[in-house]
């Protein structure tokens, strides 16, 4: 099993979530996060003054999936989150040693 963590633009959350759900990946955790990549921050103007915003609001989607589903999940996220501009996000794939459903103590793929 693998954990897929995707950091994406907040405005892309609903379309990515729907695309994942439509493909059968309904179990996910979503968190509001802030961060920055190579591009650094952004400069915003407010009442004639410039402000540097160095941590940009993003959304993190986390899913644990079977190893054979990882490439499909990555494709779905990329197809629906991409704008072609810096700041579209990153996807991380992390090994998961064990999954246990708290309610029933089922383990492995059955716990997903």
UniProtKB/Swiss-Prot annotation:
Binding site for ADP: 29, 64, 88-90, 101-103
Residue positions binding 2-oxoglutarate: 52-54
Gene Ontology cellular component annotations, sorted alphabetically: cytosol
Annotated disulfide bonds: none
Domain of life according to the entry: Archaea
Subcellular location: Cytoplasm
Keyword line: ATP-binding, Cytoplasm, Nucleotide-binding
Regulation: Formation of the GlnK1/Amt1 complex is decreased in the presence of Mg-ATP or 2-oxoglutarate. The presence of both effectors abolishes the formation of the complex.
Binding site residues for ATP: 29, 38, 64, 86-90, 101-103
GO-annotated biological processes: regulation of nitrogen utilization
Quaternary assembly: Homotrimer. Interacts and forms a complex with Amt1.
Stated role: Involved in the regulation of nitrogen metabolism. Regulates the activity of its targets by protein-protein interaction in response to the nitrogen status of the cell. Regulates the activity of the ammonia channel Amt1 via direct interaction.
Family: Belongs to the P(II) protein family.
Protein name: Nitrogen regulatory protein GlnK1
Organism, as annotated: Methanocaldococcus jannaschii (strain ATCC 43067 / DSM 2661 / JAL-1 / JCM 10045 / NBRC 100440) (Methanococcus jannaschii)
